[in-house]
């Protein structure tokens, strides 16, 4: 897997924030994109429902971090995302991780897609799509997810101008700095255990995807097609391989916050462009090593979740299209196959017997 020289070089973890019930009416949030200069996007989110909403900011248009706010396509091909994918604790959420959007209120933001995508001179399609977990106004307990999809905009990009935009994530970081902040004895022990459990869970889930119950597979991936089962099995097998070694592999695993994205309730995060995975302090303090409860979070499935994000594990890497059982099982098959939590939830279900 990688090497434990203060950094736990290897691959993954992180489970993510999410909702519990089912998706709401797609029309509750009206998301609109408008093209700005070159790769700049102006986005608005309007609450067109009758109730105030407390929306989880992480991983959405409300997030100030370089997260995947839009999907970028060149023709039919998705342009790789080069920002950060953060895993969020689903319980005991802090008030500051939410954005309250009153009924009838509109939130506006602008960002440059070139900060987290490599764009050349070409024509691209930008669209925002996903599921935002929310709590009732005044509460921080996730009650459901809202599925949304914006209009698609066509953008002509000047490649030279796009290249001049500073990247949100550098291509590499100072390894000496990483080596100065290493794993404690307890962190190393917890991470090693999580990796071992991750390998076992991923291996069992891979076998189940190949030849197990088609009904159970369809529950999480919305199809029983042999081609999709093969892809899911292969990705899980690759995760098992990465989790099985501490001294070799294609990803790097850190016990400390080398990029500075461990904010409130963040368990871990992945930088897909560099195949780096980072544990946050609450990964160790808030999660059990392995849960026996259906669809609950633990260190093992958080690690499995993060491994699927890294394209070096299996390409393409997954995204965070839906957090938690309710949102993940509301996805289409095409989006579920590229959703990290779908793999974590499926592996948990196979292990627990959900």
From Swiss-Prot:
**What does the record give as cofactor?**
Zn(2+)
Enzyme class per UniProt: hydrolase
| Keyword Repeat belongs to the record | no
Pfam families given in the database record: Peptidase_M35
Residues annotated as transmembrane: none
Q: What is its EC number?
A: 3.4.24.39
Which terms in the Gene Ontology molecular function aspect does this entry carry?
Answer: metal ion binding; metalloendopeptidase activity
Catalytic activity line of the entry:
Preferential cleavage of bonds with hydrophobic residues in P1'. Also 3-Asn-|-Gln-4 and 8-Gly-|-Ser-9 bonds in insulin B chain
Q: Name one GO biological process term.
A: proteolysis
Which segments are removed on maturation as propeptide? 20-179
Write down the InterPro entries for this protein, in alphabetical order: Fungal_M35_metalloproteases (IPR050414), MetalloPept_cat_dom_sf (IPR024079), Peptidase_M35 (IPR001384)
Q: How is the cofactor bound?
A: Binds 1 zinc ion per subunit.
Q: Which PROSITE patterns match?
A: ZINC_PROTEASE
Q: Where in the cell is it found?
A: Secreted
Keyword entries, A-Z: Cleavage on pair of basic residues, Disulfide bond, Hydrolase, Metal-binding, Metalloprotease, Protease, Secreted, Signal, Zinc, Zymogen
Query: Can you cite an annotated GO cellular component?
Result: extracellular region
The residues listed in the UniProt record as binding Zn(2+), with positions renumbered to this chain, are 305, 309, 320
Instruction: Please describe what this protein does.
Output: Secreted metalloproteinase that allows assimilation of proteinaceous substrates. Shows high activities on basic nuclear substrates such as histone and protamine.
Against PANTHER family, the record matches this protein to: NEUTRAL PROTEASE 2-RELATED (PTHR37016:SF3), PTHR37016
The family line of this record is: Belongs to the peptidase M35 family.
Annotated protein name in UniProt: Neutral protease 2 homolog BCIN_12g06300
């Amino acid at each position: 897997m990688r090497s434990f020289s203060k950094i736990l070089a290897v691959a993954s973890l992180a489970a993510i924030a999410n909702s519990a019930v089912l998706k709401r009416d797609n029309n509750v949030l009206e998301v609109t994109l408008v093209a700005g200069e070159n790769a700049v996007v102006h986005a608005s989110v309007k609450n067109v429902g009758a109730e105030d909403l407390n929306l989880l900011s992480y991983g959405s248009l409300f997030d100030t971090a370089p997260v995947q706010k839009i999907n970028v396509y060149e023709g039919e091909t998705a342009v790789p995302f080069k920002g950060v994918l953060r895993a969020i604790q689903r319980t005991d959420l802090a008030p500051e991780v939410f954005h309250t959007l009153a009924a009838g209120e509109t939130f506006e933001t602008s960002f440059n897609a070139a900060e987290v995508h490599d764009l050349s001179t070409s024509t691209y399609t930008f669209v925002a799509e996903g599921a935002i977990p929310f709590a009732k106004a005044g509460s921080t307990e996730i009650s459901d997810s809202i599925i949304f999809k914006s209009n698609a905009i066509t953008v002509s990009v000047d490649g030279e101008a796009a290249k001049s935009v500073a990247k949100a994530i550098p291509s590499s970081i100072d390894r000496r700095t990483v080596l100065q902040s290493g794993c404690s004895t307890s962190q190393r022990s917890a991470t090693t255990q999580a990796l071992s459990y991750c390998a076992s869970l991923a291996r069992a889930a891979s076998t189940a995807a190949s030849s197990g119950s088609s009904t159970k597979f369809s529950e999480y991936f919305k199809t029983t097609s042999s081609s999709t089962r093969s892809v899911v099995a292969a990705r899980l097998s690759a995760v098992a391989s990465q989790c099985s070694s501490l001294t070799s592999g294609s990803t790097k695993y850190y016990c400390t916050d080398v990029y500075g994205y461990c904010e409130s309730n963040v368990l871990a995060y992945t930088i897909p462009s560099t195949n780096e995975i980072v544990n946050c302090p609450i990964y160790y303090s808030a999660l059990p090593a392995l849960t026996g409860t259906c669809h609950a979070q633990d260190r093992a499935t958080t690690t499995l979740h993060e491994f699927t994000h890294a394209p070096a594990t299996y390409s393409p890497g997954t995204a965070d299209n839906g957090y938690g059982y309710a949102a993940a099982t509301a996805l289409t098959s095409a989006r579920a196959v590229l959703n990290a939590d779908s793999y974590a939830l499926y592996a948990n279900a196979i292990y627990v017997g959900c």
